[in-house]
């Protein structure tokens, strides 16, 4: 009787440990979102063949930018990629493994895959520009493909952003 209770308790604890160790979306957001988007773009005819999945992933990577492009580089989906662990993604996808599990396997092979993070968007309607760093102010202008010629001081960048704000900032209704 005591042995069965002990076995049940151990099984329960193992299950709890397994769910707490599972990869969460915020722990590996770029990988999970990219793998989900890629898997959703695949035709049913391709989903079972890992070689075709790899070919499609290389095509998919040619259109990616920023963090997704870096993710493709890490996996070996780009011509200039130094390493290639593409089969660590394509084979599990061919078995219909969920994106979280695929990224968990990829993280074991290359931890930097889960170091990729999307940059947090700044809400220009509620943020106090004076409290932002100059680097963040420059990033706002860069995201808008705008420049600030002659800007030296923080106040110069703030003034330029305020001038352009009506053109780029979305107002909530």
UniProtKB/Swiss-Prot annotation:
Organism annotation: Drosophila persimilis (Fruit fly)
One GO term of the biological process aspect: dopamine metabolic process
GO CC aspect terms: endoplasmic reticulum; extracellular space; synapse
Keyword terms, alphabetized: Developmental protein, Disulfide bond, Secreted, Signal
Record-linked SUPFAM superfamilies: SAP domain (SSF68906)
Main location: secreted
Family matches, as Gene3D superfamilies: SAP domain, Saposin-like
Pfam families with a match to the protein in the record: ARMET_C, ARMET_N
GO function term, MF aspect, one: calcium ion binding
Name of the molecule in the record: Mesencephalic astrocyte-derived neurotrophic factor homolog
Signal peptide stretch: 1-22
Function according to Swiss-Prot or TrEMBL: Required during the maturation of the embryonic nervous system for maintenance of neuronal and cuticular connectivity. Essential for maintenance of dopaminergic neurons and dopamine levels.
Family: Belongs to the ARMET family.
Cellular compartments annotated: Secreted
Cysteines engaged in disulfide bonds, as pairs: 28-114, 31-103, 61-72, 148-151
InterPro entries: ARMET-like, ARMET_C, ARMET_N, EF_Hand_1_Ca_BS, EF_hand_dom, SAP_dom_sf
């Amino acid at each position: 009787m005591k042995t069965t209770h002990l076995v049940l308790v151990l099984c329960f604890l193992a299950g709890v440990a397994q769910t707490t160790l599972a990869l969460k979306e915020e722990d590996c957001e770029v990988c999970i979102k990219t793998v989900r988007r890629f898997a959703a773009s695949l035709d049913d005819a391709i989903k079972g063949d890992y070689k075709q999945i790899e070919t499609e992933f290389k095509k998919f990577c040619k259109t990616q930018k920023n963090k997704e492009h870096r993710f493709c580089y890490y996996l070996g989906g780009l011509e200039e990629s130094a390493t290639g662990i593409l089969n660590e993604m394509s084979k599990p996808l061919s078995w219909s493994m969920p994106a979280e599990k695929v990224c968990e396997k990829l993280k074991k092979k290359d931890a930097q895959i889960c170091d990729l993070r999307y940059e947090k968007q700044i809400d220009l309607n509620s943020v106090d520009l004076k409290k932002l760093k100059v680097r963040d102010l420059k990033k706002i202008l860069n995201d808008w493909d705008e420049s600030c010629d002659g800007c030296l001081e923080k106040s110069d960048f703030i003034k330029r952003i305020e001038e352009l704000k009506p053109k780029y900032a979305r107002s909530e209704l």
